Amino acid sequence: CGKSRGHNRNLCRCIWMPTQDAVYQNIRYHGKKEGVPVVDDNGRVLSEVVRVMEICAEANIIFATGHSSSEESITLARKAREVGVRKCVVTHANSGIWKMTHDQIKRCIDLGAWMEYSYITNLWGPGTGLPDFERMSDKEFADFARIAPQRSIITTDLGQVGMPHPVDGMRRCILALLENGLAQKQVDFMVRSNPAQLVGLSVSE
């Protein structure tokens, strides 16, 4: 994912920090400090992570925080700015154990990060393929989305057995945002223009 050469040019658009193997997730879900860390015991970003950031900065690749904790994500966003990363995405800022306060989100944005909100929070719960998670209201999701639409992207995080198809999930998300007071232009930022900008695609009017 470093310098693009020959037929491999632009194949890498994003590098995520650990997700299912993240230490934070293992602590919260299993009570065990196992997995792949992103910071040391003093809260400093690991040198290996800094090297990944340097690659992202050099090749203009997205650096995404994965399943890091809220405070870890803020630390990563700060370090990414220091290193020169131009596309830092804070993952799942509205979701489950990664859910941030509005003040934390604003701190990340002030550090130059983009915020990702996943609509899966409004689709899981009892009677679904992910029954053990508490469902978020569409109003609460919209409240996250309206914090800074110009610095946010929306994903579905779908693809699991027993859950809606990602396309259907995105359709439901867009309708929910419009029904809860967001303007079409704001929604377009988050589901169209901003994602395209991050992965280096042009958007036709």
Label each region the model flagged:
Residues 1-2, 46, 101-105, 132-141, ...:
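Charged helix-capping and loop-helix junction motifs
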Residues 1-18, 198-204:
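N-terminal hydrophobic targeting/anchoring segments and the immediately downstream early-domain regions
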Residues 5-12, 54, 77-82, 105-112, ...:
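Acidic (Asp/Glu)-rich catalytic clusters
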Residues 14-100:
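Divalent metal-binding pocket/active-site signature
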Residues 15, 63, 115, 157, ...:
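Divalent metal-coordination and catalytic microenvironments
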Residues 112-126:
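His/Asp/Glu-enriched short active-site or ligand-binding loop at hydrolase and phosphoryl-transfer sites
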Residues 148-166:
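Short acidic/histidine-rich active-site segments
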Residues 169-205:
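Mid-to-C-terminal alpha-helical segments outside catalytic/metal-binding sites
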